[in-house]
Amino acid sequence: MSDYRLDPNDNINVSEILDDLEHYHPRRHGWAWRTPAPGLKMGQFTYEDCSEPLKSSVPLPPAHYFGDIDPQPLPTITTEIASGRFEDDIRRMRLAAHHGADHIMVIRTAGQSHFDGLIEGSPQGMGGIPVTRKQVRAQRKALDMIEDEVGRPINYHSYVSGVAGPDIAVMFAEEGVNGVHQDPQYNVIYRNINMIRSFVDACESKKLIAWAGQAQIDGAHNANATARDAWKVMPELMVQHGINAIFSAKVGVDKKNICLSTVPPTATPAPCIHIDLPYAVALRDLFHEYRMRAQMNTKYIESSTREATVTHVLNMMISKLTSADIQSTITPDEGRNVPWHIYNIEACDTAKQALVGMDGLMEMVELKKDGYLREKARELKERAVLFLEEMVEMGGYFNAVEAGMFVDSGMFPERNNDGIARKIDGGIGLGTIVKREGDYMAPVTAHYGYNNIAQYGAANPSDLIGGCTLENPDKIVFIDELDDEDNCNVRMAEVKEFAQPGAKFIRPEMEWLADGTVMLTMFFPANKLIAEAAAIECCKRMNLTDIEVISKEIMHPAEGTRIEAKGKVPFSIEIDKLVLPKEPDVMSDDEIRADIERKPMKVVCGTVGEDEHSVGLREIIDIKHGGIEKYGIEVHYLGTSVPPEKLVNAAVELNADAMLASTIISHDDIHYKNISKINRIATEMGIRDKVIFVAGGTQVASAQARANGADEGFGRGSHGNHVATFLVKKRWELEKEGKM
């Protein structure tokens, strides 16, 4: 094994981490909770709710006024890392650990839930890393060194879900992963993986989780992000929590390691504390035997990092007033780009600052025992019990899901009949469950269910082979790389002159080593159209490339606008010479309806690529959201994760007038690549000049969409009337040209 150690005054050497990786094995298994330090004295102060301090850390900015103290709150602090390049994530993990994170959650690449087995090597991901043994092993090895540096165990975490859940669970147990997401309901509701397969797989996965002593987090919080109105799924959330919690306990997971993933459902300008606190109280009343993983609200984040941060501080007030064993953080830039280094650190510092600032709060205040708080909490519990009873009356969970009972936009028992429905005899993995024969035997540890080892006279299954990979890690077959091009060695070679330590060059970066990304914050004493155009002109004059405005905040409709822009590295401005962006051209509802009555219109639409987002597209098309259906446009919705080929083929089969492609994930410009691919396929099939092609998504810009082959692109803030107007006017153009 390499004798490489971190130098506190030097950069981490990722090449050294990768050296001799095939011989690395984790030095510990299981989750590590922080050690409480009641009555902790630091500087001139005494703390009531803190944990043992770190050996090495970066204090909050004002700490120099107080002797550079850096008290650590009691809850575990989570940071989620999702750059797509694990080698860069290792550096970010070190940053986060020094700012108080001891739970590093690694996000998977888009679509990995649907992979039917393990993958190997170190390919680049989209919106996360492709979780492979090599990448897990390298990051766990790095965290071993980082936790020695900061003086506290660091928990490494990823996801045990999808079609290959048990395969991943085995690998995670082997490689010393400390925490996991595991909830078969996530597979069923959000990934459309067959129900029976999902629950059978979950039994095997949870058995391994129990063996490894991992903390398990459920997936109920996804209902918050998916529901039309997040505060209306609170009763259902408690039922989802209950199903996974008791299921996990019965399989054998220790209740002290079963964590409920709870999210305050609202954000201001809603009266969020008034709505969210009774829910938090009700949840903790019902599930006092289990741990609480307090997530932060993501559904209502916009592009303002300030607004997101305030929302997250309010979320942590609820954690403090109730309880949180794990305080997850969300980067405040999640609403505008793949999270950057600096915002992972901002999120960690926000959690530390807020929780330490509220130290000792519950010695001075208490939640009222009567009145609105308790009455509302009881009401929510009653609604949850009614939900559970109705689910049982319907024949159980599977039947209830098939009937669309979950993620309905009504506050149960109110129903709007728009929930997510999955078929018992449908979904990915259908028909893959096989009953074990009477002589079935698997010589492995932590195996769920029937295992006939008595026929061989063994007491422990793995004794038959001298121990399985869980007991004897030398039996693990380590595969380094499978792809000669898509791997970390190639990526690191491309930027080797920027690699620390001993770099020859340095560039600013936000996501990847030497990516050259910078951000500019500007204020212009003008309306938003002029301010946006002027900001872009500033960036051009600074010779930035890949320029994009990522946030616009109106200070006053006429007096001023705050702009944030990003670009890559490689002044009075005459406003009259600026090319101002045009406001959306919107026809009246009557005008649009009249044209559709004149000539009916048929469109096919779906979320393309390996992308499961659906809410935004639904708002564009659904009649109940004021979408294009209300004008009489015939809509054929193909769902999520739609391959570009399927969208074009559907347009051909249905003789559609238009294709609508939604694309939310923007990592590595995958949204524009998919737009370009759809345009190319339609051209090759000979229909491109006969069909209107519209693309949309939160990160889609009109000009870039058109440059990649779409007729128009619609970004954040677009509505059904904007899209309908464009469809009608574009059809007029094609009619004049004799193409429609």
PLM feature spans:
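Conserved, mostly hydrophobic/aromatic
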Residues: 96, 319, 613
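Domain-level signal for soluble alpha/beta catalytic cores
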Residues: 1-2, 24-37, 113, 336-337, ...
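Active-site beta->alpha loop and helix N-cap motifs at the rims of alpha/beta catalytic domains
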Residues: 29-65, 77-99, 103-234, 555-557, ...
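Active-site mouth loops of central-metabolism enzymes
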Residues: 15-26, 74-91, 153-164, 227-232, ...
